[in-house]
């Protein structure tokens, strides 16, 4: 069984064919997917998707948060709404944390001060509710590490990690797993491949970030966009980089995700279709 710890099933690219996208993932034995919200307004849509497709993907879960790319238009009222949404979601076993949150210092037209304000406010919520976080860390690893050290956050996932080995070690020390996916399928991705090969295996989780971060074969095979059904193929590439068999790798990254997201682990432990791994 495979796990995708970061997939935007609510993206517009999937809207006209979501049922077939989910079915394809199920056929490829993807049994758990994490769907992170990117805006406070997404709360109901991600919750409904996680519930609607739970028979097909029994480990389908969601997180709530405001992505840094949407911080320019975020108001104080959105943060208040997010707190209300998190409070209400605590009774839902498919709600597993706060995310996608973080900082993005690559996109030039984002106000860094606004980003930082929204990010710190969401870290405060994660600390208040003692929930793990799903982090967006593009060119912002050091700033995020500094913020995390000031808070008592119960770990989480640094999604699409592409930092240094030293930064990776610091995230791990703070209780985080590191997400890797399609970027590692490119031969030129030497730093990412080194991280996958040399980091402790217990620190790694798998993700697609679908429909984004296309794997290397996407264009050559005339595929429109990334999707969760590609998780096994991507993960097999990661296992090959690591030098271990895919069965061992699949089992290990599943346990890693469950370890860092205990509400996800509890959901899977209650499901007879998933209990043998969780």
How does the language model describe each region?
Residues 1-278:
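Mid-domain alpha/beta scaffold segments of enzyme catalytic cores
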């Amino acid at each position: 069984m495979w796990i995708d710890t970061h997939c935007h099933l609510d993206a517009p690219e999937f809207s006209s064919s979501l049922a077939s996208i989910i079915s394809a993932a199920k056929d490829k034995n993807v049994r758990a997917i994490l769907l992170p919200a990117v805006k406070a307004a997404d709360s109901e849509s991600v919750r409904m998707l996680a519930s609607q497709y739970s028979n097909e993907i029994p480990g389908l879960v969601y997180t709530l948060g405001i992505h840094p790319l949407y911080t320019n238009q975020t108001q104080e009222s959105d943060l208040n709404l997010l707190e209300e949404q998190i409070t209400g979601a605590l009774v839902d076993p498919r709600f597993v944390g706060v995310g996608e949150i973080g900082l993005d210092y690559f996109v030039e037209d984002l106000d860094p001060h606004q980003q930082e304000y929204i990010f710190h406010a969401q870290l405060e919520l994660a600390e208040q509710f003692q929930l793990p976080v799903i982090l967006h860390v593009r060119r912002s690893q050091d700033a995020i590490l500094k913020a995390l050290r000031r808070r008592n956050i119960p770990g989480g996932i640094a999604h699409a990690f592409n930092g240094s080995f030293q930064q990776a070690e610091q995230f791990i020390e703070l209780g985080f797993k590191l997400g890797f996916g399609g970027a590692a399928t490119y031969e030129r991705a030497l730093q990412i491949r080194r991280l996958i090969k040399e980091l402790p295996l217990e620190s790694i989780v798998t993700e697609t970030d679908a429909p984004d971060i296309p794997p290397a074969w996407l264009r050559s095979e005339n595929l429109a966009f990334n999707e969760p059904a590609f998780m096994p193929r991507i993960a097999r590439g990661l296992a090959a980089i690591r030098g271990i068999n895919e069965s061992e790798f699949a089992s290990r990254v599943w346990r890693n995700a469950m370890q860092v997201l205990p509400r996800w682990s509890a959901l899977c432990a209650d499901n007879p279709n998933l209990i043998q791994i969780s």
